[in-house]
Amino acid sequence: MKENYHKWHSLKLNREFEMLTFGYSGLPVIVFPTSGGKYYEAKDRGLVNAVADFIDAGALMIFCPDSVNNESWYNYSVHPSERVERHIQYENAILDEVIEFAKHETGFKKVAVSGCSFGGYHAANIAFKHPDKINFLFTLSGAFDIKRFIFGHYDDDCYFNNPPDYMPNLNDDWY
């Protein structure tokens, strides 16, 4: 199976960012790591090997970006507004850097996203907010309510990153 390591300076995060990719063509699937996980977690836990036949056949190409959870939601040394701000920077890095790279590498116009645990939150939140870029969502045991990370702080950025709050109020043509 073709495996590539990527590292670049993310303009959205203003720091180095790492990612592993597996495969050479096929539906691009972005796999988010769990809360404390890194970009190599899906490989280390056997998730990539579980779909190796699809990767080798060119049906799937897997993209495993790093996370910034310890700089955002799990960074209890900063104010909750800074946590959500860092999360938004991460989301923008995924949208503008990772997804665009995945589309370029595969020729697909949209990507699939997946994740377990807090990776499930990232997958679902980005899929719900950006159906123009994402056509499949696979999530398992996601932690979707961010209120436990913001300790009573609540503003528009929190609202628009908390699916249990914004999803019931959607009424536009995207949904």
Give residue ranges: language-model regions:
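Non-catalytic cap/lid and distal C-terminal segments of serine-dependent acyl enzymes
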Residues: M1-Y175
